[in-house]
UniProtKB/Swiss-Prot annotation:
Transmembrane segments: 79-99, 121-141, 150-170, 208-228, 245-265, 316-336, 348-368, 379-399, 424-444, 451-471, 478-498, 528-548, 590-610
Chief localization: membrane
Annotated GO MF terms: transmembrane transporter activity
Family: Belongs to the major facilitator superfamily.
Protein name (database record): Siderophore transporter fer7
The organism of origin for this protein: Mycosarcoma maydis (Corn smut fungus)
Amino acid sequence: MSNQAQDQPERRDSSSENSSPFKDDEVAADQSVSAHGNTSLNKKDRVSAVRDADASSAREGQQPGVTRIEALYRIFPRNSPIVYTVYASLAAVTICFALDQSTTAAYQLYATRTLGSHAKLFGVIATVEAILNAVSKPFIAKICDIFSRQTAYFLVAVFYTIGFVVVASAQTPAAFAVGRIITEVGQAGFDLVTDIVVADLSPLEWRGVVTALTSSPFIVLPWVGNLIQARLNTGRPEGWRWGYGMFAIMAPVCVAPIILVLMYVDRKAQKAGELSFASSRLETRRAQEQGTVKVQRDSLRDRFANLVQLCKEMDLVGLFLLALSFSLLLVPFSIYKDADKQWRNPSIIAMFVCGGVILGMFLAWEILLASHPVMNKRVWYNRTFLLAVTIDIFYFMGGNARSTYYGSFVLVGTNLSTANWGYVVNALATCALSVFGLAAGFYLRIFHRYKFLQIGGLVIRIVAMGLYLYGRNGNLTTMVVAWSQILNSLGGACSVVGTRVASQASVPHQDLASIISQLALWTRLGGAIGSAIAAGIWTGTLPDYLAATNLTPAQQSRAYNSPTTIKTSYPWNTPLRNQINQAFSKTMKPIFIVALVLAFIPLFAGLLMPNYYLGKTQNAVDGTDNSGRVIESAEDNPNAEINRKNVKYAKGTRLSWLW
């Protein structure tokens, strides 16, 4: 933070902000201008400067995790070896994560062949993973803010390692599913915490480039990973176990450096007086003024009270209700086919009813009772964030609907070898996404704007979805598959980088982890809906289409549960193989249509997205750099007009929502 911000009168406790969402904008503007050390603005200018009021209120309650990461640039210059060590440590984490993402999807196909229940297990795992990926991120983000980034890294590494141990040793489909679900928490955490730290350390003008660099290992590793998975899957009966198990060893080794170096930064910052008891600088000054620097051991009652307060700040009740409601609403799409009377089964109906009721309980809790809600009010008044959610929720919904069974469809519908199938389906898509993401990042660095690029990407993605739909009924050539993947990656890279940078630019540093996690929460839940839609269509139609072929019931069951056996059991271009291909093609048609229709909604939202100028600040709101120091005054902010519109929208939203 700046020296001016430190010298201002004692700030209010952050809880008062949460209890007063209707605070007068002019008063907020006065406080914000004072915080910036500038009182020369007239009344009109101060009202327009209310953008800083939200930022100021966020800094008032700035949590220890944010202050800790800001201390890096306050203690060490940007060219310091410690800073470069942080970058190198982040690279180790991203390489491990990229290799995981480049291989484990292929292992799952062969694991379910060994354990059975391919179609049902695939759909349930995809749905539950998407739900857990979403609801775990706000929890992990709160760990980042309340404690520290390194604490969050340690926690997710534990989940990641334990999950892969369970998966590698699984002897039943249930054990495999449990392991994958535990692993998903770790994977979601690595992705989230890395995104948060990258945004912590990079100015807006470089945010797109640095974010893309975390995905740069995907340029190389998918090709290497495909060789690894092909060798393991074809070289030994249960090679997939080795594929999963190696990450239980790699993860602790790769994540340890970033944890240790951030702990070292903490220690240096405390010695320099930037931190005290892992608290914010404001808390340190108050402790010195009040003479309470001496540490005293808490009583058992105090410890219990601290635990209760921690649970409130985590909003564990809200996260539990959210996870339970969406699980009950989405899982039936994957299991209804095996239920007696299917949709009319009392258990299926009860799941939908209970899911809807619990979702209502979640909303009531968040609006009326939660002291630290998952849906932070300051974030949800943010027009940029709401548009970003709209774009990404339908982006992931259509994308997951298309991708959940696309690998199985291409495996059966083409004559590609296992290695070439992996190259086209997995390696090409992820490599292209990384390359185009890096190019999009440099576009943002050069032009300092993102909206034109984002809209172009959304249009390209619509074309890609149309090409996926075209690739059926004999049109599924290698060229069609490749170009579908390339165009989808190009459009996705341009869209995602715009959404991420815009949403992060629209909030002060204190809200950074919250907005990243909340964007991930709702977009991943959109992905869960997409996976559930695909699972419902797949499990509801493929068995019927296979029954219309000349396969015996036993052959139908084997083809449905383990598509990998089709390549070896039914030679290419034989009558039975052609019938099977046709059954898979008919099943995918409605899935592709859903994905194509959903691709238009993000385009409409993208047209309404503001176009922030990306400069040297950490965000476009409060004029601070990555160390928390104010480097840009309110009147010099090139995004002042956008911020004024956001304030006007937020004020109207507060009145309309009655929060």
